[in-house]
Structure formats: C-alpha cells, structure tokens
Regions:
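Short "pre-J" leader segments immediately N-terminal to J/J-like domains in DnaJ-family
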Residues: 1-146
C-alpha cells in the first residue's frame, strides 16, 4: 500500500482544465518510478515549498475511493489526467495539470521533479493558470537560460 503525503486531499476530478490530450498523442512515461516512490517524492517536494492544503484531483469515480479518502488499489481512472492544486506555498498558489502519459500515476511523477527544476532551484514559479503544455515542458521553458 502506498503512503500518500499527510495533509494531501485526493478527490475525483470533475472538470479537466482545457482540452484533454488525445489518446493517440499520449506516450509511455520516461519516468521509471513506482507509485510509492512518486508519492515519497511528492511528499518531499510539498514540504520543500511549504505547501499547505494540497489537493490532487484524479479522474476516478467517487465510489472507487476508500473511507479514508484515498483511491482504492484497483481504482480505474476514466482518463490519465491529474491536477495538483497548491493554494498556499512559499512561492504563492500553484496549479499543475497534465495528461501526457498513459496513467495518472505516471502523470504525477513529472510534477514532482518539475517543481525542483522550476521554482525551487531557479527561483521561478509558474502561474496558477493551466496551459496545454505539460508541466515538465513548461518548466523547461521557464528554467532555460536566455528565455
């Protein structure tokens, strides 16, 4: 069983911000991490940016959540998109959404490493608005010198 970060609210995603990536354009994730490893990284990154009241939205039906608010082990998402909303951080409110990869678990991983590459190591935070460019590609644009 995977340990979700303390204080993280996980809830069903009711509305995707923008257009979903077409299934034909989704790809296999270049990140080789288990959900447990990704959740540990998420916990570290949330602590590093002093995130309070983080919310993760996943396209899982409400009936597939356990009593404690976590998705059941065999919960199936209707699409792989994941939205992370961080209303209170040391760099201001942040919101990330991506559906580039085949599973929501794989889409969660880039957000964890993108925070380090963007806001934490470069001192630049992305705005709370969501764009169609995946978070790790947006961070590359922000963090690339000369841009």
């Amino acid at each position: 069983m995977s340990d979700y970060p303390d204080g993280l609210t996980v809830r069903p995603l009711t509305t995707w911000p923008g257009d979903l990536t077409s299934p034909a354009d989704r790809r296999v994730s270049p990140f080789a991490a288990t959900l447990g490893t990704t959740l540990s990284a998420l916990d570290r990154e949330l602590a590093a940016i002093q995130a309070r009241n983080p919310v993760m939205e996943v396209a899982i039906e409400p009936c597939q959540f356990r009593i404690d608010g976590r998705p059941r082990a065999r919960a199936a998402a209707t699409h792989p998109g994941v939205v992370l909303s961080l209303p209170m951080t040391s760099v201001g409110p942040l919101r990330y959404a991506t559906d580039r990869f085949l599973s929501w678990q794989d889409n969660l991983a880039p957000s964890c490493w993108a925070w380090r590459r963007c806001g934490r190591s470069r001192g630049t935070a992305l705005p709370a608005a969501v764009s169609s460019t995946p978070v790790f590609e947006r961070c590359h644009l922000v963090a690339t010198p000369g841009r």
